[in-house]
Amino acid sequence: MTRRYWNINLEEMMEAGVHFGHGTRKWNPRMAPYISAKRKGIHIINLTRTARFLSEACDLVFDAASRGKHFLIVGTKNKAADLIASAARKARCHYVNKKWLGGMSTNWSTTETRLQKFRDLRAEQKTGRFNHLPKRDAAMFKRQLSHLQTYLGGIKYMTGLPDIVIIVDQQEEYTALRECVTLGIPTICLIDTNSDPDLADISIPANDDAIASIRLILNKLVFAICEGRSSYIRNR
């Protein structure tokens, strides 16, 4: 895999607060190699390590996108939900930003059934079929559609398991990460100082609570994916 330059700037990361970890009492000792200092009761993340692993992640997603691979971005924190959705749409990735339903990947046949139900209901709504049903039935189908849109809206075009999964906040998305590990799906994971850096294929040490930090990391990955997709289109 060729290494490329992704304009990852340490000063820019500091301005976004990427270096702020959790309180020193909440740390995972395995994160010690990624921590540079303690300040006012919190751990400070070593941004040179962040830059290194973010660059590796950008190389990986560029290479995968240039070969037409598919991505899934997972981040279900309320304050980051809109950011996850917009980043995924920009890079034409699938996403989960509300709740990871247990077995979403390991029990893919059930997920496929739910997705087909979702597509059928969307088609019926578009054709106006709901308008010809009794009010009670129409209301029931609309509730089902709303529920499916909330939890499956970001993966409605998925036809199979993703090739790479990008996870924002290891602690919050532990179930999703474990499912990916079980299936052997490569993972890129934002990890704060309370995380285990050994679980994902590429772990990017970063503040996973601040929106500015999450946005910066995602923007770099999205740019790399978009560049890879452009390369794929040119070389087809």
UniProtKB/Swiss-Prot annotation:
GO terms for molecular function: structural constituent of ribosome. GO terms for biological process: translation. InterPro entries: Ribosomal_uS2, Ribosomal_uS2_bac/mit/plastid, Ribosomal_uS2_CS, Ribosomal_uS2_flav_dom_sf. Keywords: Chloroplast, Plastid, Ribonucleoprotein, Ribosomal protein. It is found in: Plastid, Chloroplast. Pfam families: Ribosomal_S2. Its main location: plastid. It comes from the Eukaryota. One of its GO terms (cellular component) is mitochondrial small ribosomal subunit. HAMAP family: Ribosomal_uS2_B. Belongs to the universal ribosomal protein uS2 family. This is Small ribosomal subunit protein uS2c. It comes from Ceratophyllum demersum.
